[in-house]
Amino acid sequence: MYRGIHLLRTAAALAALAFTSTSILADPPAGKPPEHPEHPDKPKQPEFAKDLPTQAQLLDALKKVVDVGGDDNGGFGLNMWATMVNRDGIVTAVAFSGNDRGDQWPGSRVISAQKANTANSFSLPKLALSTANLYSAVQPGGTLFGLQHSNPVDTENAYKGPSSNYGQNNDPLVGHKVGGVNVFGGGLALYNKDGKLVGGLGVSGDTSCTDHNVAWKLRHALNLDNVPGGVNPVSKDDNIVYDITLDVQGHPVSASGWGHPDCGLGEKAIAVKLPTDFPIGPTP
């Protein structure tokens, strides 16, 4: 009789263990719902990136905007890097337009991240500043001289590997603050359709003037250009300003204080038309 009771208890214990094991395998941890049960192959956008496009969306838009070997954006017609950061300066996505990470200047990966961080860091809910707008103010004697040294790049996050992941969905920069301040064209603040400032975009890989043109078109393609206003004296937005002339002593002077040099490869004519050809404001 004792043996029979012992066998029954053992069987019951094994059954309970089997049920528990099955439940653990079948159910997600408490408080954590399964990711995209209707699309199990689609990764969930992390919380820090919820207000911004996915890496795939950034990549697709970048490839459409970059005109390799052409003159749609001025400059040399090179491949480009693009990086987005959220409002806290955390990198949410990195992409490149070429077929491999070596098809565009390797150094421009971190520069694009710097630009994204700068545009986000020095823009406000009611005032957008592009990195191009900062050029004149940071020159010796300018009102923001030294700004470019104020927030250094976090080199540990910027350069950790493996390099094969650079520009991919799992780029080592993603999820980290890169820091850095860049003061030439290519960085723009991102405003959603409701006018909320949600982060910054940085583009690098050609002349700084072309970088700005590509960034403007890319921001427009992502529908994140509902800009509230800026310092451009003509268009009243964050478009690049070309008003630098030489004074009697041969020193460059910006009439507005927000000027950027003309790179001289057709970029200026394109930039002047950006507010008309790619107007700011939400796309329905």
Residues covered by each model-derived region:
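Flexible, solvent-exposed loop/hinge segments and secondary-structure transition points
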Residues: P28-P284
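N-terminal signal peptide c-region/cleavage motif recognized by signal peptidases
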Residues: T20-S21
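Bacterial N-terminal signal peptides that target proteins for export
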Residues: Y2-A11
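Short, linear, compositionally biased motifs with a strong N-terminal bias
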Residues: L14-L17
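Boundary at the C-terminal end of the N-terminal hydrophobic targeting segment
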Residues: I24-A26
